[in-house]
């Protein structure tokens, strides 16, 4: 299961990639159609697409579902790590994974590179607002070369953002 609302085109692309990896029984919550039949239990594996889904995360765990931990899919690197966490959970080979994601990853890297030059070396400060701050900070530092002055977040759900926290520069000041 994938938790989090995505634009239709992004969800379609994601589902296509997951299918190409060989994953068949994938569903997204919230559902596109009200009458889609899904059940959640001990055989359900899930991953979140946004860091502010703490209550949904906790409910899935309460129902016995197994979380997949990963960076959030922000930028080429974050998205690749997010997809790899899913592939790895289901035993998909690195060779198959690399083949499936090669072209979309290259497009993503080119898109990020087109804006990164204008951001490289600049500093950014995140006021606590939406819980998106930590993965956005990771993306801007790692993929765009920005300096992080401080990263504030109204709440840090470590089960959700620990991978992005680990990838922040060691000197990053974090406030909650």
What is each of the regions a protein language model found here?
Residues 1-176:
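An N-terminal assembly and electron-transfer interface module characteristic of large anaerobic redox
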């Amino acid at each position: 299961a994938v938790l989090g609302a995505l634009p239709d085109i992004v969800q379609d692309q994601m589902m296509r990639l997951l299918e190409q990896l060989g994953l068949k029984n994938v569903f997204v919550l919230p559902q596109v159609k009200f009458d889609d039949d899904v059940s959640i239990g001990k055989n359900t594996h899930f991953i979140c697409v946004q860091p502010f889904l703490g209550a949904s995360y906790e409910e899935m765990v309460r129902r016995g579902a197994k979380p997949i931990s990963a960076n959030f899919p922000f930028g080429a690197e974050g998205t690749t790590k997010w997809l790899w966490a899913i592939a790895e959970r289901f035993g998909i080979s690195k060779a198959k994974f690399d083949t499936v994601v090669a072209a979309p990853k290259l497009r993503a890297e080119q898109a990020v590179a087109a804006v990164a030059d204008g951001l490289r070396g600049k500093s950014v400060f995140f006021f606590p607002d939406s819980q998106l701050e930590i993965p956005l900070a990771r993306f801007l530092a790692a993929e765009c070369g920005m300096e992080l002055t401080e990263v504030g977040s109204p709440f840090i759900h470590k089960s959700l953002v620990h991978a992005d926290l680990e990838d922040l520069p060691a000197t990053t000041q974090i406030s909650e």
